[in-house]
Amino acid sequence: LERSGWHHRGKSKDGVEALLGVTQVMAQNWIAELNVSVDRFKGYLNDPYKIASVLDSPGATAGYVYENRPDQRTRKSVYLENRAAVDRFSAALSFRHMQDNWQVRSDTVEFRPRWTLSERTRYIEPAFRWYRQSSAFFYKPWLSSDAGTPEYQSSDERLGAFHALTYGLKYAQTMVDQPNRRGSELSVRIEYYQQTFRQPDVPASLQGLDLLPPLKAILIQIGWRY
């Protein structure tokens, strides 16, 4: 159980988080883990730097408004992970489901196999991650001047509907100190990430335009652990 919060210039945010986890040895080379968590935040939950465009009937920008999110959010999640190993091969498979009272629902599946190479000082670890999310009930990429400003609205893409794929590969080498058999690890990881948004309904003048293009990124990470 953990509490958090901040207060600044008349605005405040408070939260409480609870986590319950169980780890079970299923077999000699198989471990399972189950976590259930609930968190609740209330107060100022807006992003003060996020604004939304207001479009008129032809699709031209008529103005801007700051976002306004509900002042309470409750999230519930379930996480299940299985790890198994056979000789020089091991793998981890996990699934996570989250839902909240903003109608955001997400599912994550991640698979990480690992092959230990010669002398057990080197290994390679591919990775695959799939993610899917629905949008918050107040998410709107833009507003219509004809409809007026709703009570709650946000154009933050992180609250929109999208799915994402991540592919990765890690190579690691253990540097063993022979006198005491302790070692450090040098690793290199490369990942490719692609995020695709669900395209919303748009005014006739904006149809055919890719207003929410896919997000693509390549991450290269070099690590040293000792």
List the model feature ranges, each with a label.
Residues 1-8, 45-53, 95, 104-109, ...:
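Outer-membrane beta-barrel translocator domains and adjoining extracellular loop/strand segments
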Residues 1-25, 29, 42, 123-174, ...:
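Outer-membrane beta-barrel translocator/channel fold
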Residues 14, 38-44, 74-76, 84-88, ...:
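Transmembrane beta-strands of outer-membrane beta-barrel pores
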Residues 25-31, 85-88, 118-121, 175-185:
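Short loop/turn motifs that connect adjacent beta-strands in outer-membrane beta-barrel proteins
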Residues 32-36, 89-93, 107, 111, ...:
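Transmembrane beta-strands of outer-membrane beta-barrel proteins
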Residues 52-62, 145-153, 209-211:
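Surface-exposed loop/turn segments flanking beta-strands in extracellular/periplasmic regions
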Residues 70-73, 98-107, 118, 214-217:
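Solvent-exposed loop/turn segments connecting transmembrane beta-strands
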Residues 169-171, 213-226:
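Outer-membrane beta-barrel "beta-signal"
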